[in-house]
Design a protein with these regions (language model features):
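Conserved Class I S-adenosyl-L-methionine-dependent methyltransferase catalytic core
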Residues: 6, 10, 18-27, 31-43, ...
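Short helix-to-turn junction characteristic of helix-turn-helix DNA-binding domains
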Residues: 44-48
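A short acidic, leucine-rich amphipathic alpha-helix
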Residues: 52-57
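Conserved adenosyl
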Residues: 107, 116-253, 258-262
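Short glycine-centered segments of the SAM/dcSAM-binding site in methyltransferase folds
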Residues: 179, 273-274
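A short glycine-rich, Lys/Arg-flanked "PGG" loop and its adjoining helix->strand segment in the class I
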Residues: 259-271
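C-terminal alpha-helical "lid/dimerization" subdomain adjacent to the S-adenosyl-L-methionine
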Residues: 278-335
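Conserved S-adenosyl-L-methionine
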Residues: 338-344
Length: 344
């Protein structure tokens, strides 16, 4: 073997171990999905330390399968095994991650989104090989529901208390009564939060995915929100309503022509209107992201499977991706004609 191609055994085993752990983790993701969809985690949170029989009865699942599932979860540290009593439970921390929907640390939306990518893996392979785009609506419904569940805690925890107050004068306008455009609203979580918090304001929410808008309308109707309307619309076709605030939450990078969209939004704003863009956490530059952003690998993965293909399926097809970084995003906003751009 040529000296330049000799394998460093220590590095080989380190890499093999890392990949093996990733494979084990992928199995754990599927176990987590089973526990979420069947209600086992929620049943365990309700019961406290309980036998396999008790958990199976409460969650209405097969007892033998449950034992195997609990054993797998115990090995990953997802549930707690009490050897002296032969019972299983969730610690408060485990419950906050796996069982409690409204906790900011609930991981199940992310799990759901990942599982959805394995449902139509043949399409992912074809897209990767051919370079064609993949429209958002071509994904399994787990992608839509999982995305909403993943981002919901962040919006609930930060949108009203941090992001909106960080923009000078915007919150006062919303309290008095303003016009808001929520673009790329998906299932409408951000739209409903603003409509509930600011009843004097009118919220118009837009998304090009019809089934998501249908579901958002149902959810808004259940809440009785009469200051919120949903529309099926391309992001670049928002009507000129002189909006006081236009928002895009974690969707700008998915758009085929983000500069063109930003230009269109600029035209729909009132003279003193504000455009707020929220994007996934990213740093400037690949090396910087790899070394200093622990979530970058995951988001580059989502970019490969979802975000870049969604962009390439639209006119222009820039393929910005979810890890473009603040410098690039601010350059694009400046290109779109926004003269005052600040990073909050």
């Amino acid at each position: 073997m040529n000296s330049t191609t000799e394998i460093n055994h220590e590095k080989l085993m380190e890499l093999f171990g890392n990949v093996f752990n990733d494979v084990a983790g992928s199995m754990a993701i599927m176990m987590s999905y089973l526990g979420d969809q069947t209600g086992v985690y929620r049943a365990m949170d309700k019961l406290g330390p309980a036998s396999v029989e008790e958990i199976a009865k409460e969650s209405k699942v097969d007892e033998r399968y449950l034992l195997e599932w609990l054993s797998s979860n115990s090995g990953r540290g997802y549930v707690t095994y009490h050897d002296d009593e032969e019972k299983f439970s969730l610690s408060p921390e485990q419950a906050a991650v796996f069982a409690r929907e409204n906790e900011p640390t609930c991981i199940q939306g992310l799990v759901q989104g990942v599982v959805g990518q394995f449902v139509k893996e043949d399409i992912a392979v074809d897209v990767f090989q051919t370079g064609r785009g993949r429209p958002w609506g071509e994904h399994h419904e787990c992608c839509f529901c999982g995305t909403e569940r993943f981002f919901r805690p962040a919006y609930a925890g930060h949108l009203l208390d941090e992001w909106i107050p960080a923009m000078e004068g915007v919150e006062d306008k919303l309290k008095k009564g303003a016009k808001v455009a929520d673009i790329g609203c998906g299932l409408g979580t951000s739209s409903m939060l603003m409509a509930e918090q600011y009843p004097n304001s009118t919220i118009h929410a837009f998304d090009f995915h019809g089934p998501s808008i249908d579901e958002a309308k149902k959810r808004a109707a259940e809440k009785g929100l009469d200051n919120l309307e949903f529309f099926v619309s391309d992001a670049a076709a928002i009507p000129n309503e002189s909006y006081d605030l236009a928002c895009i939450f974690d969707a700008w990078h998915d758009m085929g022509d983000p500069v063109g969209v930003a230009k269109s939004i600029k035209d729909t704003l009132a003279d003193d209107g504000t455009f707020m863009v929220v994007e996934p956490m990213a740093l400037d530059g690949l090396k910087n992201n790899i070394e200093n952003n622990p979530s970058s690998s995951m988001f580059y993965g989502f970019g490969t499977l979802i975000c870049v293909p969604a962009s390439k399926a639209q006119p222009v097809g820039l393929g910005l991706g979810p890890q473009a970084g603040p410098k690039k995003l601010m350059e694009l906003l400046s290109e779109a004609g926004f003269s005052s751009v600040s990073l909050a």
